[in-house]
């Protein structure tokens, strides 16, 4: 993980996590189907289930007041993906039953830190991803907090995530350490060909929102 400095949210600094998940599914699913004789499907982000709740129910972390999954080891800087199956839980070695999700201590740090909550506005991350013109108020918030894409303010305020970062939490997966872009510039964006651009999580809204945001930050 970087030290936090930059204008791109942590999750979008590496290549697109969807790319990693697709490769993971391609390796795991054929082996699972061969072993169990059932159908398996992988999902990441676009999923038929509420991923953060399901992950908490699976014991992978607690749900924060910012709706993020918070892992004890990694804080909220985690990606959630899942493989669903037609197999019965017992077939896969699970005892069955429906566990309940777990929740954070509700200290309120994330909500207090968010510059948008008190104003009744959209998450700053959503503002950075909007297409078209921003309102004067939205432009002011974007320039004040310096994000070209996404926002980590509520996550960085969370004491559970702070503890994970202080402990030096780092993913062992090399993919997420390679070719990172903590700071995006107009020059860096212009030098990306379409293939490279499409390998980034910030590409899904096209180049225009990014260019607009970068121009605002440079004013």
Where are these regions (language model features)?
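Short, contiguous, pocket-lining structural segments
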Residues: 75, 99-109, 143-150
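Iron-sulfur cluster-binding cysteine motifs and their immediate structural context
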Residues: 109-128, 146-174
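Extended alpha-helical surfaces
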Residues: 162, 169-188, 199
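Auxiliary alpha/beta "docking" domains used to position bulky ligands
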Residues: 1-103
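Short, charged low-complexity linear segments at domain edges
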Residues: 72-98, 117-139, 190-194
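Long, compositionally biased charged/polar accessory segments in the mid-to-C-terminal portions
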Residues: 195, 203-219
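Alpha-helical packing segments of well-folded alpha/beta enzyme cores
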Residues: 24-28, 110, 154, 210-214
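Short Fe-S-cluster ligation motifs
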Residues: 134-153, 182-203
